[in-house]
Every structure is written in structure tokens, then in C-alpha cells.
């Protein structure tokens, strides 16, 4: 669908091969290839990749693509009415309340990064957030494809025009991680570059089992749908969510509803990690608290922000809200 829509707009759409590589477990990659072939997807095992270090092989996915998401969104939303600065304070079946009144609709989709209905869906148990970092390096070798490590904390690589985009340093929001320092050390070692041309960070919402939550918000909220927990595959999963939710609202089945069901079992190992993280945040002795559910805020010296490790809310140095699920600013003057 992206390829079809991209033909109608200038969004720097580029067809490229994609690779998932491993540094340690080539057998895992071979099993992945076998599973993909069984399902009928074009994929192959390759031993040589265009990266500055040795790998144990990779899965190659031919004819994948990258594009500029803001230009793409500007095009597909050109005929829509988008109301900014309309902060939703309460969401219920059939209505959404904000400072200026109430919005009503028979069907509603909640698609924030982190859903904010604590009394429905138990999202505060089922979701957590991750930070990751990117540096853009100019005039370095073309890796001729898009690469991501199969390990959660691995590196990613792809080119855009004259730049190589190197990503990594991932960690749970509010916890110490590699961050910019890890990324800077890597580009210095492998590319001899002391300072990147551009650099930025991103935040992703993660589900307990790595599968997004797409479907009815909860059994007790008829007509209210949700799409969240896209992990680090937001552009891919958002299109899948659009298709699934459209079919559900129109009363048609896709066959994928049970896979992405937001009410599926949450008894996963990550649930216990989330629970322990929340308990640690609640019991940490500090006056600086997240307004979402009262967890302790921790100072992030690399980005000069106050971060919550429980659910991933982030605040500027003066307490102004940056990332949800918190719905307001934090009091950090204490």
C-alpha cells in the first residue's frame, strides 16, 4: 500500500533490500529464513553484508523500502480536518472530553503513543517505553541496504542521500543505557568521525510480547478502538493497524484480530519486569514524581530531561511535559 500511495507524492520513496543480521547466532537466522519460506515470504540467508564489522550472517528481504514520513503524512492528510491543541482529558465509548467541550462519535480510535485510559485496558501494565538514538554521518560508504541487528540493543544502518544513518544505544526510558556515548564511541571506532552532522533520539512504545495491540480497547468499551505498542516498527505497523481497524469498524474480518487483540493474555515474562519497575519507581524516595501514577522521576544528563522508568513519561528541565502517558507537567522545583 505504501508503494502505491508513494507514487502519488514526493516523499523520497526508495526501494532497498532489508537485512536482519546477527553477531553470534547464525543458526537463529537460518531458522528465521526457513520459517519465512514456509509462510511464502521471499527471504534468503546471506553471509556477506556491507557493514564495517564481521557478522554471522543475515536474513535478506528483497524490495523493501524507505521514505520520508512527514512528506507522506502531509500528502495523505491533505483533505482531512486536523484539530491541534485539543487535549483530550477523558475518553469513553462514544465521547471524548476536552477543555472546550465534548466530541461525540459512534466509533473512535485512540492512537496515542501510549494510551492514557488507566481504568480500561490495563495499559500501564502491558506497555513500557524505550529510547534509541541516531547519528547522521556524511560522506561515508554506502551500506547498500537497510540493516538491523536481531539483538534488541544492536545497531541499525541505512543511507539517505549523502548521509549514513547509524542507530543504537537503546535502553528503557528512565534507565541508564548506552545513549549518545555508546553511539559516538562506535562511529569514532569504525568511521573515524568525532562529531556527527546531525543526531536525534526517538521513543518507542513496547508491548509485553513484541506484538502490537490493535483492536477493541477493552471488552467494556464498545465502539472504542486502540492501536499502540508498535515497538520500533511504527511505519510498518501503522499501515497494518489502519487496515485491521478499518475492516473491524466496517464489520469485516481479517483473520488477524486474535493475534493483535489488546485483551489477549498478559502473562508474559516482561509483565513481571514492568511490575518490578513500577514498584521500584513508587518506592524510590524522592519528591520529584511523575503526575501519571506517582513514580519517581530520574534526571537524564544526556538529554537534560526528567524521565519516568515506570511508563516512559518525559519532562523538560523545568517540568514541561514532553512524552505521555502523563497528562500534565511535573513539579520538579521541590
What residues fall within each predicted segment?
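Rieske [2Fe-2S] iron-sulfur-binding domain
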Residues: 135, 284-334
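Flavin-dependent oxidoreductases
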Residues: 91-160, 167
